[in-house]
Amino acid sequence: MTATGIAEVIQRYYPDWDPPPDHYEWNKCLCPFHGDETPSAAVSYDLQGFNCLACGVRGDVISIIRHEEEVSFAEAVRIAEGLSVGGNIPVQRKPARKPSRRVFGESRSSGSSGSTVRPGIRGRSTPWS
């Protein structure tokens, strides 16, 4: 990975924290933010996210920096870019998700043009006609 990872950012503020090995999508670990005895947090290297079920700290690289440094979003982005390998590589953004539902008015086949009314409806009588 060429950009700053979530584990590197957390280790910057908590050097004694041991990041979990990358085995699953969400890897259980001890939370460095409140110091616990049993794993109550999880790190995702694929999604670049952190979530603790005990203390509620969650987020990505930018939100962890904002939480620790108490800075604005723009300043957190500048800090993260300074931490990345080479110093001028932009921070890795979260992968874009596809919308799970169709937007009202979109046809099912995006390539079709013309009327959006299905042919079977035109021939039917309606209660108000």
From Swiss-Prot:
Biased composition regions of type Low complexity, renumbered to the chain: 106-115
InterPro entries given in the database record: DNA_primase_Znf_CHC2, DnaG_primase, Znf_CHC2
Region annotation Disordered: where it falls in the sequence: 87-129
GO MF assignments: DNA binding; DNA-directed RNA polymerase activity; zinc ion binding
Keyword Zinc-finger tagged: yes
Record's keyword annotation contains Transferase: no
UniProt keyword annotations, A-Z: Metal-binding, Zinc, Zinc-finger
GO biological process, one term: DNA replication, synthesis of primer
Domain of life from the UniProt record: Viruses
Cross-referenced Pfam families: Zn_ribbon_DnaG
Protein name, UniProt field: Gene 58 protein
Species: Mycobacterium phage D29
The gene coding this protein: 58
